Curated annotation (Swiss-Prot):
Assigned EC number: 6.1.1.7
GO molecular function, one term: aminoacyl-tRNA deacylase activity
Protein name: Alanine--tRNA ligase
Binding site for Zn(2+): 567, 571, 669, 673
PANTHER family: ALANINE--TRNA LIGASE, CYTOPLASMIC (PTHR11777:SF9), ALANYL-TRNA SYNTHETASE (PTHR11777)
Family, per entry: Belongs to the class-II aminoacyl-tRNA synthetase family.
Taxonomic superkingdom: Bacteria
Gene Ontology cellular-component terms listed: cytosol
UniProt cross-references to CDD domains, sorted A to Z: AlaRS_core
Cofactor: how and how many bound: Binds 1 zinc ion per subunit.
């Protein structure tokens, strides 16, 4: 058998079938774009459904591919077993009504056994078939020469997912030898059984029947072939390694994790081996998924990514990794996969940023959640129960963002379980509260009662008209029809023709008035009625308004002018965000008022100051270029072909309104806009913030509001300069001088603190105790921060030469703990990381680190003395 890399096997497979007249289908994105039923692309055939069901006729009925796939239904088994993965590659060859069994079997055998290709020993291959598939038996036995004792008939060799194409399948198994199993009394030791010796190499499915609604099977007029070979499993066989994780597809990530952690893979510790495997698997999945456009969040595929990253971080603690590190593995994945997936390396910086951002968020979550969970577990044990209540599990999830899966894993380690039913009950209560809140909001809208009965037409003409003659066609007061509204009364009305824009697409409604002889009506708001008409919220200021009255409808043009400036600016901002941050940016919400604009968008981390500056400059440059804004009606397909940006989740009709700003911005939009970007005047970003997982918000102003803001800022600058007795242009020099003075004072303060620390360290040596022949010092000290604590620790370790030292300090009701072990005692089994974790857990905290030095935090200062007392117990337990 040849020595081949995973990349060589993949390419060899595609080359083989290309020689057999197959077209190579590119590996599709993991995020399905044509199949809403799938969360992820999860098999090689998933992207080819359009061909198999006849919606699309392929140019070539013979297809081959190497398809990246994600499956997370067995996530808890990843790392525990030899071959479970969340990300894998499926190699396949497919026939859409062209060749069938004989060719599929013949080519599979040729690829596996020919010296030109894989070169397996034929004697080590066995096959399984369906008991009634005599055709497959004949091909295997008579044409391929496989002896009948190596052709196993199994009932489960039938591919059927309900109604639709189905048929028997044949699987090919490789015998890895007695080293992987030689107990022939084991009922599972056969090709197709649960064992490590006979591994499935390839599954060939023969779609030859149609499963009818009545349960019967009839022959398909066109028979299809669908085969699948897992690249990772095939590589483990070719490279003769015990698991998929030991192949060159995973070992570079495991090796990098060894370097980061200082731990060794396959060093006799099964728990650590599992951690290495989980990390290697999950970073592959996350790297590819983010590269294909998915981002961590709290729902859907985003939650899958968050769960995988957090599970990997959780396992990394078993390797004493207590910092963000997964992002460092992204370029390693890119290098491994670059031959077939060069885009991973191209996007590595972006992917690494996403991963690092998520890791940092989770480390904060872990710190708080672990401390609370430790208390919950301790409380449960005190109450003599082995079940963590659903209420506690929900509190961890809802308040601290601690995933239920992690709570379950921690509970399992402590020999406990989680009340899942109770947790789900709490989740349902939360959903009910959310539904009730939504109902409360809806009840405030003017979309109930008689309004649902109003079918009269109302035409909106406000894109090009600011005033129009109109008639009141419906008048409502307190949810009931009325014939009139008197002075001071409020109500709702519909006009047969209206220039008033109804709030939608983030743009607020127009304001204005209705005028008639002796009548003046203020229009306060406009919303969409249940049947789509513009519904005006009004108050009568003069006279009496009657149903069927003829009125002149006039919008507040000053207000509209400010609104349209801000709306067109959001379009420019959207494109500028994509230009600066990347094409992953998508609109997640907006608000356009006359005073300001607010734009929410998908992005993995805080937008940096220099990025904000670039974004702001781009928008202003487009304003100053005086670009015409063109608005047109297009067929939806034509608009998409033009590249128009559509809002995710928004439903559009067959004909859409396209807003185009020169050749810079192209969006589907029903709102109001300026005729030329010059009308916007100036654009100024006011704030940037995060409003949820993977969602950022920019607030900005334009025109007069931007001028007033900048004028205020100049005023503040002048005032600050006056207080510092300088002029505005020299203010930075003055600030730098003040900083230098402060820095010098800090330096003097630190020097004094170091001297005091050294004196205190000298005094502490008098408190050293000997426990079972080991010098032990556990003390509460007065220092300002962790840096001073480290300085004191170094002084003590140098003075004592051989000792176990634990120092704790309390500042602002927070506990800092530092443990240190000298080199000679590390070899005797003393471990600072394990010790500090135990000490911290006794004062409401958590932490860990290296054998020689480790830090932790706590939340209960009153328990510090009691926690430090444990140090002697620890030393005694290790010395036994």
């Amino acid at each position: 058998m040849k020595q081949l890399t995973g990349a060589q096997i993949r390419q060899m497979f595609l080359d083989f079938f290309q020689e057999k007249g197959h077209a190579v289908e590119p590996s599709a994105s993991l995020v399905p774009h044509e199949d809403p039923s799938l969360l992820w692309i999860n098999s090689g055939v998933a992207t080819l459904k359009k061909y198999f069901d006849g919606r699309v006729i392929p140019q070539n009925p013979r297809i081959t591919n190497a398809q990246k796939s994600i499956r997370t239904n067995d996530i808890e088994n990843v790392g525990k077993t030899a071959r479970h993965h969340t990300f894998f590659e499926m190699l396949g060859n497919f026939s859409i009504g062209d060749y069938f069994k004989e060719e599929a079997i013949t080519w599979a055998w040729e690829f596996l056994t020919s010296d030109k290709w894989i070169g397996f020993d034929k004697e080590l291959l066995s096959v399984t078939i369906h008991p009634e598939d005599e055709e497959a038996f004949t091909i295997w036995n008579e044409k391929m020469g496989v002896p009948k004792e190596r052709i196993i008939r199994l009932e489960e060799n039938f591919w059927d997912i309900g109604e639709g194409p189905s048929g028997p399948n044949t699987e090919i198994f490789y015998d890895r030898g007695e080293a992987y199993g030689n107990d022939f009394s084991d009922p599972e030791l056969y090709p197709g059984g649960e064992n490590e010796r006979y591994l499935e190499v390839w599954n060939l499915v023969f779609s030859q029947f149609n499963h009818n609604p009545d349960g019967s099977y009839t022959p398909l007029p066109k028979k299809n072939i669908d085969t699948g070979m897992g690249l990772e499993r095939m590589t483990s066989i070719v490279q003769d390694v015990p698991t998929n994780f030991d192949t060159d597809l995973f070992m570079p990530m495991i090796g990098a994790t060894e370097t980061i952690s200082g731990e060794k893979y396959r060093n006799g510790d099964l728990e650590k081996d599992m951690a290495f495997k989980v990390i290697a698997d999950h970073i592959r999945t996350v790297t590819f998924a983010v590269g294909d456009g998915a981002l961590p969040s709290n729902e859907g595929r985003g939650y899958v990514l968050r769960r995988l990253l957090r599970r990997a971080v959780r396992y990394s603690k078993k390797l004493n990794i207590n910092r963000p590190f997964m992002f460092e593995l992204v370029p390693v994945v890119g290098e491994v996969m670059k031959d077939f997936y060069p885009e991973v390396l191209e996007k590595k910086d972006f992917i690494a940023k996403v991963v690092k951002n998520e890791e940092e968020r989770f480390h904060e979550t872990l710190h708080d959640g672990e401390a609370i969970l430790s208390e919950v577990i301790a409380k449960a044990k005190e109450e003599k129960t082995t079940v963590i209540s659903g209420v506690d599990a929900f509190r961890l999830y809802d308040t601290y963002g601690f995933p239920i899966e992690l709570t379950e894993e921690y509970a399992e380690e402590a020999g406990m379980t989680v009340d899942h039913e109770g947790f789900e009950n709490e989740m349902e209560k939360q959903r009910e509260r959310a539904r009730a809140a939504r109902q409360d909001v809806d009840s405030m809208q003017v979309q109930g009662g008689v309004l649902g009965e109003v079918k009269v037409a109302s035409e909106f003409v406000g894109y090009g008209t600011v005033a129009t003659e109109s008639n009141v066609v419906a008048l409502v007061k307190n949810g009931e029809y009325t014939d009139s509204l008197q002075v001071g009364e409020e109500g709702q009305l519909m006009l047969d023709v209206t220039p008033f824009y109804a709030e939608s697409g983030g743009q607020i409604a127009d304001r204005g008035c209705l005028l008639a002889d002796g009548v003046k009506v203020l229009v306060k708001d406009v919303q969409k009625a249940p049947n789509g008409q513009n519904l005006h919220q009004v108050v009568v200021e003069e006279g009496t308004l009657t149903k069927d009255a003829a009125v002149k409808a006039i919008i507040d043009t000053k207000n509209r002018s400010s609104v349209v400036k801000n709306h067109t600016a959001t379009h420019l901002l959207h494109q500028a965000l994509k230009d600066v941050l990347g094409t992953h940016v998508n609109q997640a919400g907006s608000l356009v008022t006359s005073e300001r604009l607010r734009f929410d968008f998908s992005h993995f981390g805080q937008v940096q100051a220099d990025e904000l500056e670039k974004i702001e400059r781009i928008v202003n440059e487009k304003i100053w270029e005086s670009i015409d804004v063109e608005i047109s009606q297009k067929a939806i397909e034509e608009a998409k072909e033009m590249g128009a940006m559509a809002l995710f989740g928004e439903k559009y009709g067959d004909v859409v309104r396209v807003v185009q700003v020169g050749d810079y911005s192209l969006e589907l939009c029903g709102g109001c806009h300026v005729d030329n970007t010059a009308s916007i005047g100036i654009f100024k970003i006011v704030a940037e913030s995060g409003i949820g997982a993977g969602i950022r918000r920019i607030e900005a102003v334009t025109g007069k509001s931007a001028y007033e803001l900048m004028n205020d800022q100049v005023g503040l600058l002048k005032e600050a300069a006056g207080k510092m007795k300088t002029n505005p242009k020299d203010i930075l020099t003055r600030v730098d001088g003040l900083f230098a003075e402060v820095k010098q004072l800090q330096k003097e303060n630190e020097s004094l603190a170091a001297k005091l620390s050294n004196i205190e360290a000298g005094n502490l040596t008098d408190s050293v105790m000997t426990v079972d022949g080991v010098n032990v010092l556990a003390a509460k000290v007065n220092v300002a921060d962790m840096n001073n604590l480290r300085t004191m620790m170094d002084d003590l370790k140098n003075k004592l030469e051989s000792a176990v030292v634990v120092l704790a300090s309390v500042n602002d009701d927070k506990v800092n703990i530092l443990a240190g072990v000298t080199k000679d005692l590390i070899s005797q089994g003393y471990h600072a990381g394990k010790l500090v974790k135990e000490v911290a857990s006794r004062c409401g905290g958590g932490g860990g680190g290296r054998p020689d030095m480790a830090q932790a935090g706590g939340k209960n200062p009153a328990q510090v003395e009691e926690a430090l007392a444990f140090v002697q117990e620890y030393v005694k337990s290790v010395s036994k």
